């Protein structure tokens, strides 16, 4: 809204056993309402879709993160994690740009704390956090800045029509009919 003022917005989420507050900074508007900074994807862009876990492992220290459910790490197994991360993408930006790529699109990189099959990113458990196994929020911001310095674009893929079984909206839905449920597996 035009009357919005810069400052911290507090988003309050009701959960079993209490409330969770998330502080979200609202910054001053960019000149031209962002049109001088952000450029949308057009038909002239060459988009490269990358499944980050399968691309390049630039930081082996985040391959297995203590406390996360999926500790698999085996490049020989199709459904295990392979260790690719955002640092691996950053390390290969010259190569990617050399291919003529103008925009990067990743399969979802938000936290996907499921017990297995987390390599694809489509069972998000936290829409507010970049998965630590990819390098986390700060590294995602660094990648975004580096792409923009190169005149490249970043497409953020977020899935909102389904969530992982450990997402707070699955564990503590705001209403009983919030998520469709069937007595048996349905395909």
Give the positions of each predicted feature.
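Substrate-binding/active-site clefts of carbohydrate-active enzymes
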Residues: 45, 53-187
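Extended acidic/polar, glycine-enriched regions
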Residues: 1-40
């Amino acid at each position: 809204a035009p009357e919005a003022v810069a400052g911290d917005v507090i988003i309050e989420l009701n959960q079993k056993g209490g409330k969770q507050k998330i502080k979200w900074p609202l910054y001053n508007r960019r000149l031209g309402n962002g049109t001088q900074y952000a450029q949308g994807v057009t038909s002239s862009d060459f988009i490269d879709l990358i499944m980050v876990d399968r691309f390049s492992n630039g930081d082996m220290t985040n391959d297995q993160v203590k406390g996360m459910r999926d500790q698999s790490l085996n490049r020989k197994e199709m459904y295990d994690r392979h260790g690719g991360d955002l640092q691996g993408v950053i390390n290969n930006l010259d190569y990617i740009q050399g291919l003529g790529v103008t925009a990067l699109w990743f399969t979802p990189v938000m936290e996907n704390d499921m017990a297995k099959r987390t390599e694809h990113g489509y069972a998000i458990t936290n829409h507010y956090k970049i998965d630590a196994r990819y390098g986390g929020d700060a590294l995602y911001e660094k990648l975004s800045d580096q792409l923009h310095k190169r005149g490249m674009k970043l497409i953020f893929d977020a899935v909102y029509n389904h969530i992982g079984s450990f997402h707070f909206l699955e564990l503590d839905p705001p209403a009983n009919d919030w998520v469709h449920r069937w007595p048996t597996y349905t395909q």
